[in-house]
């Protein structure tokens, strides 16, 4: 969302962000030619959440709680599932990418590819853990974020 907002601002000749931060996200060019997959069933969607290890198991095992939160989680996932990348020139703002070393869906090369989306500086930092590395390495991430925002 932040990447497309920066591109939208550029098309409108508005100031770009001083720094674009992305976390746990493949570079958008990996979506080139993407065809959105069919909507998963509730059971398939919950199993995908379980594999990402970011939602507590007790939440995923509580039918009443799932009934409340599943629609919002599905909408969030739909934004990504239906995103189609369109080629444009690289941005003129720096990009900093963060990710987890054990993320099964976003490998280091997916993060490194963000460098192709900028004419300015690019940096990347990996933290131990999977897609939700922030849950375990919150302090380390916040220290890196503070450093990057003050450079």
Please annotate each region the language model reported.
Residues 102-106, 132:
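Acidic catalytic loop of the alpha/beta-hydrolase fold
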Residues 107-116:
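Short alpha-helix in the alpha/beta-hydrolase fold that links the catalytic acid
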Residues 97-99:
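Short beta-strand/loop motif that positions the catalytic acidic residue
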Residues 129-139:
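Catalytic histidine-centered segment of alpha/beta-hydrolase-like enzymes
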Residues 3, 7-47:
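Flexible "cap/lid" loop of the alpha/beta hydrolase fold
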Residues 89-95, 118-121:
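Short, proline-enriched alpha-helix->beta-strand connector loops that line the catalytic pocket
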Residues 70-88:
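Active-site nucleophile elbow and catalytic-triad environment of alpha/beta-hydrolase enzymes
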């Amino acid at each position: 969302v932040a990447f497309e907002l920066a591109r939208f601002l550029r098309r409108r000749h508005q100031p770009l962000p001083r720094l674009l931060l992305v976390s746990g996200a493949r570079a958008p060019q990996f979506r080139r030619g993407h065809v959105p997959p069919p909507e998963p069933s509730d059971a398939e969607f919950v199993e995908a959440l379980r594999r990402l290890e970011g939602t507590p198991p007790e939440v995923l095992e509580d039918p009443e709680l799932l009934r409340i939160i599943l629609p919002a989680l599905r909408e969030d996932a739909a934004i990504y599932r239906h995103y189609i990348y369109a080629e444009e020139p690289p941005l003129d703002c720096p990009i900093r990418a963060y990710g987890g070393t054990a993320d099964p869906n976003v490998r280091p090369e997916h993060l490194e590819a963000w460098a192709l989306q900028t004419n300015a500086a690019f940096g990347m930092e990996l933290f131990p853990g999977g897609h939700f590395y922030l849950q375990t390495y919150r302090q380390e991430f916040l220290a890196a974020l503070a450093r990057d925002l003050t450079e």
